[in-house]
Amino acid sequence: MSPPIQLLSPEIVNLIAAGEVIDSLAAVVRELVENAIDAEATRLTISIVPELWQVTVADNGRGMSLENLRHCAKAHHTSKICDLDDLWKITSLGFRGEALFSITQVGQLTIKSRDATGYQVGWCVDYNQQGEIIKEQTSPMASGTIVTASNLFGTIPVRRQGLPTIKQQLKAIQGMIDNMSLCHPQITWQVYHNHQSWLTISPGKTPQQILPQLLKSVHFHDLQFLCETIITPSQEQAKLEMVLGLPDRTSRGRLDWLKIAVNGRVVRSPRLEQTILAGLSRTLPKGRFPVSFLHFKIPPSEIDWNRHPAKTEIYLQSLEFWQEKVTEIIEKALKLSPLTITTVGQNQRVKKLLKASENKGVYNVGTSHVNELDLIKLRAVGQVNKTYIVAEHSQGLWLVEQHIAHERVLYEQLQDQWQLIPVEQAIILTQLSTKQVEQLERIGIDIEPFGENTWAVRNVPKLLENREDCPDALIELSLGGDLETAQVAVACRSAIRNGVLLDLAQMQDLLDSWKKTRNPRTCPHGRPIYLSLEESSLSRFFRRHWVIGKSHGI
């Protein structure tokens, strides 16, 4: 006979629920940090002692009164929602009233807090497994809250043994802090591991100032920050912020820094991630991935957070609308802007050029403030090695590689209009495999048998129409890839070759066309197209600030 179905005891129910919320040291840190941010803290101090299974989070937020301290660790007690309607108006990071109670189920909880609204003294409170106070006493302290969770998972040895290694848990904690610091750049973070300083993050006005502190290889001017105000389909106001690593300056070998946040929390959204990758398609070399942080600040009524205990999965209304806005903001970020046409990141290459003539001296190139009219007046003045166009503007000059600049122009033209035109005389190809024939048909080529191991092609991409190497280009197209790959191949083969002499008019035409492209920074293979040399950098190199003497007329 099967065992009878019984009602679980409250103790078992609570422990199961706690395991959904608190499953690691990182989860404890996450929940306490979210509470601190909800309390409007601007400074967080976190201490982790793995050997003691102890986490302490101190903040300078609003703090709690003794009355709130008596209820805050009880199950389903919260100040953030009151009724069912509030579930669709959530503006806080926490709202379920589960975190502190869940910590009491898996460890020992102590809270010190002082209400910021006029209380002269704080309170120190210890809790039992039911979230009830077992000890309370006054505690002199500044306004804010200090939460200590210790002996975590001590009553569940099987759970503790099944957790990742301490090293892995510390990595997870660092990743969580990285994410939260990007979402809340106004906060100062000080993190200790075994009482030794481990992480420090200074505050900033935007996440563009935070990201270089997290990725030491990335500089402030390697990044483009945009903030767009958007009217949603429900006619409410929202904001979309993006920090994008400019593809000609920084990238990653792994897809680990493509981050999406919604209303202060990093979330997983495969469809939005694919939208970002599609928007950055053909801007990075093969095997390289973008550095990107995208933050949606949208009305809470358009989000359902109540889908995952860690709130990392959400339902977002009008997802197609937001995908379109993401594509638009990426296009804007890739444009040549006044603040990013020359950079500290690019200057690493400039420094190598300038230092080739001397062993000492570092010439930093500052941020250019060339306005949009100056960009329009970019003027071709010469050609170097029949490869690089020398272009002058009011604050310096650029070196533009002619082949890949033209390749970018042609590629975007092909993207906008993939035009196949009939040819008067069929182009004969031989020794094609079945897969090659299928590939040509897949990209729209009209091909038919023309004898044994021979094929006749009746139409070709317009750019290849009058080229002598058109048969070779068709064979290249037959070797695989999607339509985008074919467009890149055609653009590359059709672009002006390096080693071709151009006159000033041809160079100027190319510069004008190149500046109008959606992504003038890199070619479709991900190579940088231009190098900027500021006049101020050249001036420092030639010591134009030196005072030699009046007799020299300087």
UniProtKB/Swiss-Prot annotation:
The keyword Cell cycle does not apply. GO terms for cellular component: mismatch repair complex. The lineage of its organism: Bacteria, Bacillati, Cyanobacteriota, Cyanophyceae, Oscillatoriophycideae. HAMAP family: DNA_mis_repair (MF_00149). One of its GO terms (biological process) is mismatch repair. This is DNA mismatch repair protein MutL. The gene is mutL. One of its GO terms (molecular function) is ATP hydrolysis activity. Coiled coil: none annotated. NCBIfam families: mutl, PRK00095.2-1. Signal peptide: none annotated. This protein is involved in the repair of mismatches in DNA. It is required for dam-dependent methyl-directed DNA mismatch repair. May act as a 'molecular matchmaker', a protein that promotes the formation of a stable complex between two or more DNA-binding proteins in an ATP-dependent manner without itself being part of a final effector complex. Belongs to the DNA mismatch repair MutL/HexB family. InterPro entries: DNA_mismatch_repair_CS, DNA_mismatch_repair_MutL, DNA_mismatch_S5_2-like, HATPase_C_sf, MutL/Mlh/PMS, MutL/Mlh/Pms-like, MutL_C, MutL_C_dimsub. SMART domains: DNA_mis_repair, MutL_C. Keywords: DNA damage, DNA repair. Pfam families: DNA_mis_repair, HATPase_c_3, MutL_C. It comes from Crocosphaera subtropica (strain ATCC 51142 / BH68) (Cyanothece sp. (strain ATCC 51142)). It comes from the Bacteria. CDD domains: HATPase_MutL-MLH-PMS-like, MutL_Trans.
